[in-house]
């Protein structure tokens, strides 16, 4: 069987959906299935078996900025690839994202499986409901990565959704060396209000001087937050880092913090952190609380509350059970 897996987002820019697509493709190949990933790439493809569809364009979506490829040149590259590859099955992710995914569904040269990742209200689902339903009706099997994602899709489009949770490649994250950085907190995610980075930075005011904070990635809030924290030597700004460095940091840090304010349907990075041996401190939002079994597998705090976050971080860093 030959499967074409289509990403709406740039595969060279870190993101939960992109990581899931690349990991799933590798897992299927290990089972002897021929998989090719098609998607935008802003630079050399990050893995083998990828057909680049050109550069991405920053596009506002779900309270964030996504690296999509809605331009005509990307659609022409996709059409050419579908014609040449002749896939037996297409697996599209975020089926209503502008760009190659919708193009593939409209053309429909093979049976289609679609996976919905996003959760929460969507203006595009609301404004373009009729054409969105037409597109969705061309899909044979609809999947969602969480109940929240399924509810979002069902409310907008109707239909049935099989919930297939995200997964990770455990061997890549398993802790191979002892923890090396005591009293260290790691954050990775786009620097924008929805991800709650500013809440985390405010919480540092309540923590002892020995606590270190590593901040990876970048975004529209980066320069402002760097300026506001330029006198705090405890905070290290890492910029965009490779997947390998992300895993290394997860394995070295004392705890991983996910302070998102909302809009998270699953939170795969929490799985990555737990698999790496890091304690997780996360906001008490549906996408995180269900993943952590109501807080049994993480310390949860009220989203947006920097004081509550500081208390959770201090508990994770200093109470004996947290290091076990």
Predicted features along the sequence, with ranges:
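N-terminal strand-loop element at the rim of the active site
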Residues: 6-14, 21-72, 80-81, 219-220
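Conserved donor-binding/catalytic core segment of Leloir-type glycosyltransferases
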Residues: 176-208, 213-214
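Acidic anion/phosphate-binding donor-loop and adjacent secondary structure
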Residues: 151-154, 165-183
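Conserved acidic donor-binding segment of nucleotide-sugar-dependent glycosyltransferases
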Residues: 294-295, 299-306, 315-321
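Membrane-proximal helix-turn-helix segments that form the acceptor-binding/catalytic region
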Residues: 120-142, 149, 155-156
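Nucleotide-activated donor-binding/catalytic signature segment of Leloir-type glycosyltransferases, i.e.
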Residues: 223-247
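Short hydrophobic beta-strand element within catalytic cores of glycosyltransferases
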Residues: 279-282
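Carbohydrate-associated surface elements
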Residues: 41, 148, 167
